[in-house]
């Protein structure tokens, strides 16, 4: 019997401010073949075609490399998907969402691979995009998209539940060995989170991530997170270092530790209040592995967006004289 030829799938993009819509596109792309290659555009090429991304190159590479559906990352992939690159990597399928992506000249970015007959569409994820996230952050009008006691959007909760079920099917690692726990709100998922989770996973054999729901997050940050609990869970589920996700309290006690069979608690790099672990000090272990993205935070990202907008406005003013 002839051996099965591995089908390589190519999916490229900016993957700016990585969210569960990106993850879902990569999940669907992986399902089209056996091996998924993710091409990530550089900030230079993105800026030439559509404007400066919020996240820098290395930050976007780190997050995409941390996605469980991705087998290989090609850095600085061209904005217009080239047949030469497809042939170089032995790709048989090119996948992208069912929307048309145009370059700065108005040309379809996938025109070359469409002509080759290897282009496949995947469904876009409802209600989420980088633009949507930026809009939520800038407007700060959370009352318009969060309702109900726990802050979940009642309109979209059924859709999110279906996605959670699909994402869950990719998380099947057996719980054994040394169990590590890390918690936080993981809002605006970024390279700092990914690096922190990678380091924590390296401290044991199985990583449980505790996510703080919307109301808990509001209690200790004084504002709702930008993304709802289910939205944040979806993005975490796509991270290859995460084995299990639970909704966890802000104050982690010994009963919680015993119930989940946790051996080690690893505070996230951005944990500001370590006193909440006072009742379980004997299992708290700080990793001193370097997190080169420890400067990232929601505030830092917001400041970038404001700065990028000002740069854009200034360029437009010079261009139009207005």
From Swiss-Prot:
Protein name as it appears in the record: Probable ethanolamine-phosphate cytidylyltransferase
Family annotation (InterPro entries): Cyt_trans-like, Ect1/PCYT2, Rossmann-like_a/b/a_fold
Gene3D superfamilies: HUPs (3.40.50.620)
Enzyme class at the top of the EC tree: transferase
Taxonomic lineage from the root: Eukaryota, Fungi, Fungi incertae sedis, Microsporidia, Unikaryonidae
Metabolic or biological pathway, per its Swiss-Prot or TrEMBL entry: Phospholipid metabolism; phosphatidylethanolamine biosynthesis; phosphatidylethanolamine from ethanolamine: step 2/3
UniProt entry keywords in alphabetical sequence: Lipid biosynthesis, Lipid metabolism, Nucleotidyltransferase, Phospholipid biosynthesis, Phospholipid metabolism, Transferase
Pfam families: CTP_transf_like
Name of the gene: MUQ1
Top-level taxon: Eukaryota
Similarity comment: Belongs to the cytidylyltransferase family.
GO cellular component, one term: cytoplasm
GO function terms (MF aspect): ethanolamine-phosphate cytidylyltransferase activity
Known EC number: 2.7.7.14
One GO term (biological process): phosphatidylethanolamine biosynthetic process
Catalytic activity: phosphoethanolamine + CTP + H(+) = CDP-ethanolamine + diphosphate
């Amino acid at each position: 019997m002839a051996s099965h030829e591995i089908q390589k799938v190519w999916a490229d993009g900016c993957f700016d401010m990585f969210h569960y819509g990106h993850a879902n596109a990569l999940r669907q792309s992986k399902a089209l073949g056996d091996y998924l290659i993710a091409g990530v555009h550089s900030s230079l090429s993105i800026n030439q075609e559509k404007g400066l991304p919020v996240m820098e190159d290395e930050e976007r590479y780190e997050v995409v490399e941390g996605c469980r559906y991705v087998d290989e990352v090609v850095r600085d992939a061209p904005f217009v998907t080239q047949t030469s690159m497809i042939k170089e990597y032995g790709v048989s399928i090119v996948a992208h969402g069912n929307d048309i992506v145009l370059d700065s000249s108005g040309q379809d970015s996938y025109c070359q691979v469409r002509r080759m007959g290897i282009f496949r569409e995947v469904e876009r994820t409802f209600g989420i995009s980088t633009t949507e996230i930026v809009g939520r952050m800038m407007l700060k009008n959370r009352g318009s998209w969060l309702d109900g006691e726990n802050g979940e959007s009642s309109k979209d909760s059924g859709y999110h539940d279906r996605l959670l079920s699909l994402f869950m099917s990719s998380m099947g690692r057996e719980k054994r060995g040394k169990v590590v726990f890390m918690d936080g709100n993981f809002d605006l998922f970024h390279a700092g989170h990914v690096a922190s989770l990678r380091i924590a996973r390296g401290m044991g054999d199985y990583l449980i991530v505790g996510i703080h729901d919307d109301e808990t997050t509001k209690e200790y940050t004084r504002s709702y997170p930008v993304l709802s609990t289910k939205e944040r869970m979806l993005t975490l589920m796509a991270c290859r270092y995460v084995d299990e996700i639970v909704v966890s309290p802000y104050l982690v006690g010994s009963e919680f530790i015993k119930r989940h069979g946790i051996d080690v608690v690893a505070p996230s790099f951005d944990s500001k209040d370590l006193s909440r672990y006072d009742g379980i000090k004997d299992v708290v272990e700080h990793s001193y592995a370097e997190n080169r993205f420890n400067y990232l935070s929601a505030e830092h990202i917001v400041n970038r967006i404001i700065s990028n907008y000002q740069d854009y406005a200034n360029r437009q003013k010079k261009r139009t004289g207005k």
